[in-house]
């Protein structure tokens, strides 16, 4: 189906004949080889055992065409992978592309990010941070173009001309580092959203990492 086709395309784009990485593929799902998680790395040097994880999911819900959901995430993901290929960095940067969920015979479906977080914890990897790339395709200077669910007490601007960083309170330092670097090269405003444990639980893709003790932030257009 389209999810498998997309996974193969991303694997090809990241590969040695295109961007230049050697891809590592994990097959997941109740039939063994139904869904793919694609990983590539830019190896670190002095602190190579410390890993910054950059995650994008490439599947869309049935109610949302891909261009309206995560096509922008995949585009940013590939752009970052291309930027960092063959660069020298103290820490290892690992790029992971995955479907949002994959089928499980016991629970019905499992979040791919949950699988990734469990694997990192099991293998005792030293994740210094996780960046989850959300949708980034919307930008507007129109008044009242930004809204947010009423059950969150977040004071967002009403004009959707900014990048949102959403994370747990334990990700405070990671978000500040991101903002410091981003604002040196871009004039786009950045809104920092620090959520408590109860609020972060509403964001499945984030909470699976915070529950394992990993600092995580989501980069998004409107949150």
Regions picked out by a protein language model, each given a short descriptive name:
Residues 1-45:
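A non-catalytic alpha/beta surface segment that caps or lines the substrate-entry region
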Residues 2-4, 21-29, 89-93, 188-199:
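Surface-exposed patches in mature extracellular/periplasmic domains of secreted proteins
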Residues 4, 8-12, 75-78, 82, ...:
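Solvent-exposed, polar/charged alpha-helical surfaces in well-ordered, non-transmembrane soluble domains
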Residues 11, 39, 50, 143, ...:
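Soluble extramembrane regions of membrane proteins in the secretory/endomembrane system
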Residues 11, 15-20, 81-89, 101, ...:
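Sec-exported extracytoplasmic/periplasmic mature domains
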Residues 34, 61-173:
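Acidic/histidine-rich catalytic neighborhood of metal-dependent amide-processing enzymes
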Residues 39, 51-55, 94-97, 128-134, ...:
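Structural recognition of the beta-strand scaffold that forms the well-ordered cores
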Residues 136-223:
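Active-site-adjacent substrate-binding region
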């Amino acid at each position: 189906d389209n999810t498998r086709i997309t996974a193969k395309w991303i694997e090809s784009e990241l590969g040695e004949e295109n961007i230049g990485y050697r891809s590592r593929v994990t097959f997941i799902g109740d039939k063994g080889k139904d869904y793919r998680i694609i990983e590539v790395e830019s190896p670190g040097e002095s602190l190579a055992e410390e890993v910054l994880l950059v995650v994008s999911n490439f599947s869309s819900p049935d109610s949302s065409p891909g261009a309206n959901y995560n096509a922008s995430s995949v585009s940013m993901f590939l752009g970052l992978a291309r930027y960092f290929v063959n660069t020298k960095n103290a820490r290892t940067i690992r790029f992971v592309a995955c479907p949002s969920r994959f089928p499980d015979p016991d629970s019905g479906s499992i979040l791919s990010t949950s699988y990734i977080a469990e694997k990192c914890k099991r293998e005792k990897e030293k994740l210094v941070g996780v960046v989850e790339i959300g949708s980034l395709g919307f930008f507007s200077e129109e008044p009242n173009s930004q809204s947010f669910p009423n059950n969150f007490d977040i004071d967002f601007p009403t004009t959707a001309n900014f990048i949102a960083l959403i994370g747990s309170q334990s990700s405070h330092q990671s978000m500040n580092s991101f903002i410091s670097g981003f604002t040196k090269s871009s004039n786009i405003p950045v809104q920092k959203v620090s959520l408590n444990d109860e609020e972060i639980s509403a964001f499945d893709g984030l909470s699976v990492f915070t529950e394992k003790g990993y600092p995580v932030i989501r980069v998004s257009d409107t949150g």
